Amino acid sequence: MLTPEKISDLVSDAVASIPYPAEPARLYQPIAYTLESGGKRLRPMLAVATCSALGGEVSKVIDAATGIEVYHNFTLLHDDVMDRADLRRGQLTVHKRWDDNTAILSGDAMLTLATMMIAKAPAEVMPEVLDLFNKTAMEIYEGQQMDMDFENRNDVTVKEYMEMIRLKTSVLLGCACRTGAIIAGASQQTAQAFYDYGVNLGLAFQLRDDWLDTYGDPLVFGKQIGGDIINGKKTWLLINAMTELRQELCDILAEDLDDEERVSQVRAVYDRLKLDERCHSLIADYARRAVSAIDAVELDDDARQYFTSLAVKSIDRTH
């Protein structure tokens, strides 16, 4: 299997090498701006790593892997418009630097570009890869709609929330892994095992994001701590607190408090309920499920270590 450094370099080079026409600049500059802003590149690395681990030719997966990354960033462009977010990865969001219409149209172009790149998968598997991508994209839109619907509800259950983050976040990681497996020529059973790995890893990552938003170090996390509380965002932490201490939490959220005091009081409720430790335990559980999903797959030691390490890092990552 390729080394982690080689996988990272391949993905970074592929994203940096996407050719953009010079005109119209207002369409393409925001795309370059978004893709040059960094990010973990987790999804394309999963596609490349899975293909490599299963003995596939990495050159055959790199276009699809890059397309998945372009698609992921398209969803962020539109999410930022819907959420009215000002910052993404420490810089102005596209709709703030340009305007809403630019963010929408550049996002549309990214969706088409992503589909074109994914369609470059080897001809013998291209229909399967494209079907998987389209199914995944529809699930992501369903998850985003659920997230928006939750904004107007105070009775969201943990089960509903977990289904929402599975759709909105996790299935794209599963798609990336399965795409790599398909292009490597793996069996359906192996492809499904890696899909399950990606979905469980995605759940661990999203739950850790929830945790970091409340308990992280702002200098390391790169975002304002307590943003989810301030914005009334439904997270695993808030939903559990609402289930157990609804009236007290509703009183705090309704009270005329400054942001710092509101975050402090809500976090105190979380602490009393030991939601910090309970969330951490659940993250570790999903990380274990990810590793267990590929237990039966024949992998060399380096490959198994790569995927195990990714899962373990999801438990205690700081950003």
For each of these PLM feature ranges, what is it?
Residues 1-19:
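N-terminal amphipathic/basic leader segments beginning at the initiator methionine
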Residues 11-14, 204, 290-293, 310, ...:
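Amphipathic alpha-helices that form helix-helix packing interfaces
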Residues 286, 300-319:
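Short, amphipathic C-terminal "tail helix"
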